[in-house]
């Protein structure tokens, strides 16, 4: 009898494990977590269009990611770019988003989250950012 609640708890824990923020450098099949923290998520909504900016910082390292969403069921990621400095190196490129979340209506404070892949000049994914649904403040 005690096994059923234990199994349920384990399944619940595993199912919620990916709901944490993480900024990773992709090194081939390996990913290395970097200490950059989400410093702010700002944006505007105009009808079905959302433009947002996320800022990440850690000491001298900083990165800004700009994304555009279109709110149809389900929400669509339209485009994104990033630029910043990591490890003393200037970086910039395109953003891809295989998974996006958007919650909130016209009058509610919207929340945005998802998995964002930052690409280099050769269109290779070099960074992955996992963001749980995070309230977006107005610019």
Question: Which residue stretches match the model-derived regions?
Answer:
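Short, solvent-exposed mixed-charge patches
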Residues: 137-139
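Sec-dependent signal peptide recognition
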Residues: 1-7
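C-terminal motif of bacterial Sec signal peptides marking the signal peptidase cleavage site
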Residues: 12-15
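Central antiparallel beta-sheet cores of small beta-barrel/beta-sandwich binding domains
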Residues: 19-108, 113-134
């Amino acid at each position: 009898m005690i096994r059923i609640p234990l199994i349920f708890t384990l399944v619940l824990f595993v199912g919620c494990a990916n709901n944490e923020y993480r900024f990773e450098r992709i090194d081939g099949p390996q990913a290395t977590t970097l200490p950059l923290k989400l410093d702010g998520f700002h944006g505007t909504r105009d009808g079905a269009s959302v433009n947002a900016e996320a800022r990440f910082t850690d000491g001298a390292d900083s990165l800004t990611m700009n994304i555009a969403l279109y709110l149809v069921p389900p929400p669509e990621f339209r485009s994104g770019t990033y630029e910043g400095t990591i490890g003393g190196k200037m970086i910039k490129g395109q953003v891809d988003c295989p998974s996006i979340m958007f919650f909130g209506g016209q009058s509610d404070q919207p929340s945005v989250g998802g998995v964002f892949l930052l690409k280099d000049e050769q269109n290779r994914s070099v960074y992955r950012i996992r963001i749980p649904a995070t309230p977006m403040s107005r610019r």
